[in-house]
A protein has these predicted regions:
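N-terminal auxiliary segments of SAM/dcSAM-dependent transferases
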Residues: 1-59
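Conserved alpha-helix/loop element of class I SAM-dependent methyltransferases that forms part
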Residues: 78-96
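Conserved SAM-binding strand-loop segment of SAM-dependent methyltransferases
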Residues: 148-159
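A short acidic, Gly/Pro-enriched loop at the edge of an enzyme's catalytic core
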Residues: 160-172
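A short SAM/SAH-binding and catalytic strip from SAM-dependent methyltransferases
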Residues: 170-180
Length: 180
């Protein structure tokens, strides 16, 4: 079984942006270019508004498609893998030590740190909100099993209210979290 670490840019977000770009272009053509049902100043205003919306949506869509391809684990750049592996290289747990990964998403960083630290264990927490619905506790557990990692566990948690006593962890990681 192969792990499924997903992508930092959710597919649903890409589809929504593409739909928004197409809609703003259609409205620009209908009201701005062809002036169907409108004329004069209103046509100009609608043309400017929908033209601006189209440009903004198209540029943001272009950037998100580029980011999606860059962050893909299966793509050419594999930027996520480089970042995850590069971060995990800096985590060294003592014998019996415990590390915490805040905002673990699909478990990639938690699992990478656990693989590099078989003498310890890693705990991954995430709130797994609706904006990243493809990430879940179950996905993390499946990814750990796919990687053959047994020294990683996952649980629901909140980065703003960590439910652990002070001094519980020997290392703490967090990646792609504080942008939300």
């Amino acid at each position: 079984m192969k792990p499924d670490y997903k992508n930092w840019i959710p597919k649903g977000m890409l589809f929504s942006l593409i739909a928004g770009t197409a809609l703003s272009l259609a409205l620009l053509l209908v009201f701005g270019a062809f002036g169907i049902g409108v004329s004069g100043k209103l046509r100009v205003v609608l043309g400017v508004v929908f033209g601006g919306a189209f440009v903004v949506c198209a540029k943001y869509t272009q950037w998100c498609v580029y980011a999606y391809r860059s962050f893909s684990y299966d793509g050419e750049r594999k930027l996520s893998k480089q970042i995850i592996d590069g971060t995990a290289e800096h985590i060294t747990l003592p014998e019996g030590g415990v590390g915490l990964d805040v905002g673990c998403g699909s478990g990639a960083l938690t699992i990478a740190c656990a693989k590099r630290n078989p003498q310890g264990k890693m705990v991954g927490i995430d709130r797994w909100g609706k904006e990243y619905a493809s990430f879940s506790l179950s996905l993390c557990e499946k990814n750990a099993a796919a990687e053959g990692v047994r020294n990683a566990s996952f649980r629901r948690g909140n980065a703003l209210k960590l439910d652990f006593p002070d001094e519980s962890f020997d290392a703490v990681t967090s990646n792609y979290v504080y942008h939300n």
